UniProtKB/Swiss-Prot annotation:
This is Dual-specificity RNA methyltransferase RlmN. Pfam families: Radical_SAM (PF04055), RlmN_N (PF21016). PROSITE patterns: RADICAL_SAM (PS51918). It is an enzyme of class 2 (transferase). It comes from Cereibacter sphaeroides (strain ATCC 17023 / DSM 158 / JCM 6121 / CCUG 31486 / LMG 2827 / NBRC 12203 / NCIMB 8253 / ATH 2.4.1.).
Length: 392
């Protein structure tokens, strides 16, 4: 861990246009942006709202990637769309499937950069963990992603594209003319992959607008959870402009320990963070905030820590997710023992808070919480990485 690592950033987000003078990528445009783009391309204003709705449904409900297949649009209008627009997703480089069914995707985005996306199937639901940045600036000492330097923000298209690619892989797009199937393989989405979502607020917000739209991908805001290490100035804005569920990467009950585990705490300490959370359930219409707490042997797992945690979150509708530390090569910590984790959970439960212990998933493919890191960073430098680092 670098003690003086930067905790703010001024990073690049690639422009939405495809290679110089090329068509505009529709993926990731909000409805308002799509409507404006259609008008700019020559769609009569009186028709633009209807046309935007039709294109939206083809792309996000049916999963169509070819304008020629949008058969309720006139042929000349399909030609206009093909001239000015494209439907472009990131590229799946590799897919690994864990013994427990977890799927990890290495996804290549513009510039040759790579991020990881994880799908976790469970009985009755499936959760997709998406990334919001290439690398991370926060250098949390227990997190593998934190050892990879920040390269850039993902665009809204690259965030939405992760969900669309996984739906491709799972065969989840509906079949036209077939009976409607209400079963959702991807029923929940968590912004808990690589990066700090609130350091990429605008793109994350716009991506979630697309994901939550009822005529397309249609994931309810109650089934979307954004995890932040505590970017305090953006928390109220998250409630008002996104309104999804909120999870806090908390992990310590004193500033002394949290400064080491989550260095952003040096800027916004525990008291400041907790004060910013008290209005979130009301502003976002969410029931409670989730506090994520990774269990590190001899670091943050004492009975005194559990009692302090309960006292700190008093008055905030909460649940505490206890996360057994998922080790990675060179990690400076060890997982707390099962007995210690159970005792910690018992103190929290007796104080009146839900305290589920997360079952590690995908450990055999390095897909568990805190283990994500681009494969090119883990292993040799590939041509894609070299190109990325030189700005190509």
């Amino acid at each position: 861990m670098t003690a003086n690592a930067p905790i703010t950033q001024d990073v690049m987000t690639l422009p939405r246009k495809l290679p110089e003078g090329g068509p505009v990528n529709i993926v990731g445009l909000t409805r308002e942006e799509l409507l404006a783009a259609l008008v700019a391309a020559g769609t009569p204003e009186r028709q633009a709202k209807m046309r935007a709705g039709q294109v939206w449904q083809w792309v996000y409900h049916w999963g169509v990637r070819d304008f020629a297949q949008m058969t309720n649009l006139a042929k000349d209008y399909r030609a206009l769309l093909a001239e000015h627009f494209a439907i472009v997703l990131p590229e799946v480089v590799t897919r690994q499937i864990s013994a427990d069914g977890t799927r990890k995707y290495l996804i290549r985005i513009a510039g040759g950069h790579e991020v990881e996306t994880v799908y976790i199937p469970e009985e009755g639901r499936g959760t997709l963990c998406v990334s919001s940045q290439v690398g991370c600036t926060l250098t949390c000492s227990f997190c593998h992603t934190g050892t990879q330097k920040l390269v850039r923000n993902l665009t809204a298209a690259e965030i939405v594209g992760q969900l669309m690619l996984v739906r491709d892989d799972l065969g989840e797009w509906p079949e036209r003319g077939a009976p409607k199937d209400e079963t959702r393989l991807v029923s929940n989405l968590v912004l808990m992959g690589m990066g700090e979502p609130l350091y990429n607020f605008e793109n994350v917000r716009n991506a979630m607008k697309v994901v939550m739209d009822g005529e397309g991908l249609s994931l309810s805001r109650r089934r979307i959870t954004l995890s932040t290490s505590g970017v305090v100035p953006e928390i109220a804005r998250t409630a008002e402009e996104i309104g999804c569920q909120l999870a806090i990467s908390f992990h310590a009950t004193t500033d002394e320990v949290r400064d080491i585990l989550v260095p952003i705490n040096k800027r916004w300490n525990i008291r400041t963070l907790l004060d910013s959370l008290r209005d979130y359930p009301r502003l976002s219409n969410s029931e409670r905030i989730t506090f994520e707490y990774v269990m590190l042997d001899g670091v943050n797992d004492t009975d005194a820590d559990a009692r302090r945690l309960v006292k700190l979150i008093s008055g905030i509708p909460s649940k505490i997710n206890l996360i057994p530390f998922n080790e990675w090569p060179g990690a400076p910590y060890r997982r707390s023992t099962p007995e210690r984790i159970a005792a910690f959970a018992d103190i929290i439960y007796k104080a009146g808070y839900a305290s589920p212990i997360r079952t590690p998933r995908g450990e055999d493919i390095m897909a568990a919480c805190g283990q994500l890191k681009s494969a090119t960073e883990r292993a040799r430098k590939s041509r894609a990485q070299i190109a990325a680092e030189t700005g190509l």
